[in-house]
């Protein structure tokens, strides 16, 4: 079984679906990308959380966001 993750952000330019061999690899990729987004959005202030099969990060009151959806759940 492949573990697919869908990434989306407010720009719609870099949206993608990626496949991983294991659930652990997929979860590690989500964590790594989330950390990158935290660094990028640090100066704007951000909030983030897990909602069911999605992990999201956003700027409260702003347009910036990114999400990672676990498609195997």
Residue ranges, per PLM feature:
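Short aromatic-glycine-(Arg/Gly/Cys) micro-motifs in beta-strand/loop hairpins
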Residues: 1-16
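Conserved aromatic
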Residues: 19-23
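Short, mixed-charge low-complexity intrinsically disordered segments
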Residues: 35-73
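Short beta-strand segments
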Residues: 15-18, 66
């Amino acid at each position: 079984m492949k573990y697919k993750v869908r990434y989306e952000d407010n720009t719609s330019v870099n949206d993608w679906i990626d496949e991983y061999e294991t659930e652990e690899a997929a979860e590690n990729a989500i964590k790594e990308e989330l950390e990158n987004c935290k660094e990028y959005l640090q100066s704007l202030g951000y909030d983030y959380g897990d909602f069911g099969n999605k992990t999201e990060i956003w700027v409260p009151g702003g347009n910036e966001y990114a999400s990672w959806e676990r498609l195997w759940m």
